[in-house]
A protein has these predicted regions:
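Catalytic or ion-coupling anion/metal-binding cores of large enzyme and transporter domains
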Residues: 1-51, 58-79, 84-85, 90-95, ...
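Glycine-rich, N-terminal phosphate-binding loop and its surrounding beta-alpha-beta segment
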Residues: 66, 105-109
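A short, small-residue-rich loop immediately preceding and capping a beta-strand
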Residues: 109-131, 143-146
Length: 575
């Protein structure tokens, strides 16, 4: 069989071999089935968290769609590190590393088994960019399908997310709640399957997938346990076969306009700073030029129009009921912020998707154009002698634009968390956590334990936090991450001492360590760096290959050529 371009399917290199067919036969794959488009169905099911717990069920529905459309589905799984469960532990250092491992493992399966197309089912934070990176690297017809957001928990009339539990720990330490209330929040926060419910990293990236065009429009917003998930999963499988037959390649969709639309989607919803890292990485794999200044340029002109947690009031399921991303797209098109002609993997343009939006009467999640929640987007990129290569500050959910104070330095996250719990963080402090970068960790941990404890202790309006690590999408407050160069690579963050004055000014986009250059040079000459004790095995391999956070913390040096569009050596069926 061939695609519409007349070229033989890639899979015939495998399925044309008698030996391969013999080994497929016990699995139920006949000659007739093997002659169809072979579509890999990748997922990350595991029992290590609720985010991906529905993946096997979704994979079954996707496979039904593939078979109904005349294709043959091949299900396989890969890993997932659950961010929320490993948060605050050494295990969290594996999270960002897993993005690369997932990408690599999908590439290995697709290239080795010569799949003609791919559906990548994603859920927890790093699985989403990993799926997109794999498709961009392979340039193989396919799509990304998000398994969906968890429903909110409820306690005393309030919607809960997992961040509610993290912040309740800080509130307990501050004497604001008792242990019984913490336990009640803990037991109510996560009512079922699905990824974390606010506009944290998973939902931020799930939105970005639709604006990049890699996910069918409207599919990702459907909550994890919604009955429509069956329908959208089957449709995704059918679409994958069509993409193979029409030879629609990811890089034809992943244009510069698509990346700009994705940036707008994340800054206009107050999304996770992790999107900066991930979009840089996806663009790298797709061969699309993208840099930190693009995020600044777009965020500066993009107001926040979605009132979503952690900076706002609502969760992802509320956005779905309000009218979904199609409604947000209508707002963004009307405001002239996005490229309406950018095309989705389902064949429609963003303008066509937005035109079909149905706004729920009385909804308050997506605000009117003349009532933005903030005049500029939810992040800013700032530079200075503390971050010559740049760093990211989250602006959603607060109005602070500057901070000056003495440094309080910690060599790792655990020491800082204990200091917060012990009440050793004071008003005006600039909390500095270093040795948590891509190399220094290794793995660039998220700091939700610390940031949530600061919020829970009532300090978020009075301190700043600066780190060469990352923040969870659930973080809010005056927090600065991705400081580059990191401490382990000789960055100035490694030279800061307790009491050093630090000034942060969003208006001028500057972060300044107010110490004479001669003193900094003396400290630099005396500083000795020691590798992290975690830097062995896969962690050590990552530390040896990872690039700066300012470049997306990628481990490949350049975009790949992509898989061959024709079978390299189509074998005769009689072999």
């Amino acid at each position: 069989m061939s695609n519409n371009g007349g070229a033989p399917l890639r899979s015939t290199t495998i399925t044309g071999l008698a030996t391969a067919r013999a080994m497929f036969r016990p699995l139920g794959f006949t000659r007739e089935r093997l002659a169809r488009p072979n579509v890999g169905v990748a997922h990350m099911w595991s029992e290590t968290g609720p985010c991906n717990f529905s993946h096997r069920k979704l994979a079954g529905w996707v496979k039904e769609g593939i078979e109904a459309a005349g294709g043959t589905a091949f299900e396989f799984s890969t890993i997932s590190i659950n961010d929320g469960i490993t948060m605050g532990t050494q295990g969290m250092k594996g999270s960002l590393i897993s993005r690369e491992v997932i990408t690599d493992s999908i590439e290995l399966m697709a290239r080795s088994h010569m799949f003609d197309g791919l559906v990548v089912i994603v859920g927890c934070d790093k699985t989403i960019p990993a799926g997109a990176m794999a498709l961009a690297r392979l340039n193989l017809p396919g799509l990304v399908l998000y398994s969906g957001s968890i429903a909110p928990g409820h306690f005393r009339g309030e919607d809960l997310t997992i961040v509610s539990v993290f912040e309740a720990i800080g509130a307990l330490d501050a004497g604001k709640i008792d242990a019984a209330e913490l336990q009640a929040i803990e037991e109510a926060a996560c009512p079922g399957a699905g990824a974390c419910g606010g506009q944290f990293t998973a939902n931020t990236m799930a939105c970005a997938m639709e604006y990049l065009g890699l996910s069918p429009a409207g599919a990702n917003a459907v909550p994890a346990v919604d009955e429509r998930k069956t329908e959208v999963s089957r449709q995704a499988g059918e679409l994958a076969v069509r993409l193979v037959r029409d030879n629609v390649l990811p890089r034809s969709i992943l244009t510069r306009d698509a990346f700009e639309n994705a940036i707008v989607s994340f800054v206009s919803t107050g999304g996770s700073t992790n999107a900066v890292l991930h979009l840089l990485a996806i663009a790298h794999e797709a061969g699309v030029p993208l840099e930190l200044e693009d995020f600044h340029r777009i965020a500066t002109r993009s107001p926040i129009y979605a009132d979503l947690k952690p900076g706002g009031r609502y969760v992802a399921t509320d956005l779905y009921r309000a009218g979904g991303l199609a409604l947000l797209s209508r707002r963004l098109i009307d405001a002239g912020l996005v490229h309406p002609d950018a095309r989705n993997v389902d064949g429609r343009t963003l303008a066509e998707i937005a035109a079909a939006a149905q706004e729920t009467p009385g909804q308050r999640v997506v605000v009117p154009l003349d009532q933005p929640l903030k005049q500029t987007g939810g992040i800013e990129i700032i530079y200075g002698n503390l971050a010559p290569e740049g760093c990211v500050i989250k602006l959603a959910g607060h109005d602070r634009t500057s901070h000056a104070g003495p440094a309080k330095v910690f060599e790792n996250e655990e020491d800082c968390f204990q200091a917060v719990r012990d009440g050793r963080i004071e008003r005006d402090d600039v909390v500095v956590i270093r040795n948590e970068g891509p190399v220094g960790g290794p793995g660039m941990r998220e700091m939700l334990h610390v940031t949530a404890a600061i919020v829970g202790a009532g300090l978020s309006e009075h301190v700043a936090l600066v780190t060469d690590g990352r923040f969870s999408g659930g973080t809010h407050g005056f927090m600065i991450a991705h400081v580059a160069p990191e401490a382990a690579k000789g960055g100035a963050i490694g030279l800061v001492r307790d009491g050093d004055p630090i000034t942060i000014d969003v208006a001028t986009r500057r972060i300044t360590l107010d110490v004479p250059e001669a003193e900094l040079e003396a400290r630099r000459a005396a500083r000795a760096t020691t590798p992290s004790p975690m830097a062995w095995g896969v962690f050590g391999k990552y530390a040896d290959t990872v690039r700066s956070a300012s470049l997306g913390a990628v481990t490949t040096s350049a975009a790949s050529p992509g898989v061959a569009r024709t079978a390299a050596a189509a074998a005769e069926p009689s072999r």
